[in-house]
Amino acid sequence: MIYELNHVGGRVRDLEASLSFYDGLGAEVVDRLFMNNSRVHRVHLQVATGLVELLHHEASDPQATYGLNHVGFMTDDLDGDYARLMALGYGEISSPRVAGSGQGRLAFLSDPNGVRVELLQRSEEFRVPPITSGPVQGLSYVAVAAPDVDAAAEFYGTHLGMERVADDTFRLGADAVKLVPTAGSSIDHLGLTATEPAAEAQDPDGNRVVFLPAA
């Protein structure tokens, strides 16, 4: 069963610049490791209530695309959930395998609009209690591209088991996805609740961050 929206993640060009940006939002590093075989640095940051996964490859690649590019969900039955979603006709990206970190197993598929979705089964837990000492009080949502809103709603609501908390927003665990019909990229932006009004920002790889008033 899929039981948690765990993180949003992607590939970063300059790891230290990205860490500095999120540090300015009050984020804290909750996990950091180096995958020697692939020469990839992986960092999990917690931004208030939500996790952001940053992946930095030591080798340069002129063909690489940088920025947030997937949402990750936790499951207690990776093989079963993956097979079920494949039988429903969703696009295969990579079948279940041992994670490069050695921490559990993972698989990737695409939602109806081409957004990369990671399924994870592992015992490690990186999330810590909410970090609210900085300007950001919560990760309100991850905005994902949804030109076909109805198909996306069926995927996230019916087939991933997320709770529909608004017409365009689905929650599972602490975090939520918001469906954006006119998104500029697969992960359109992060919606963060903040103590003070602030202009929209961009991280070093061009990911948009929208600040929302805290309740």
Can you say where each PLM-predicted feature lies in the sequence?
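N-terminal beta-strand motif that seeds the catalytic metal site of vicinal oxygen chelate
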Residues: 1-16, 68-73, 120-153, 159, ...
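Core segments of cupin and vicinal oxygen chelate
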Residues: 2-3, 10-51, 80, 87, ...
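Acidic di-acidic motifs
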Residues: 14, 77, 111, 148, ...
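Conserved short beta-strand elements that form part of the metal-binding/catalytic scaffold
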Residues: 28-63, 112, 116-123, 161-194, ...
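Vicinal oxygen chelate
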Residues: 32-33, 82, 86-138, 144, ...
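N-terminal accessory/assembly segment that mediates macromolecular interactions
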Residues: 44-51, 55-103, 109
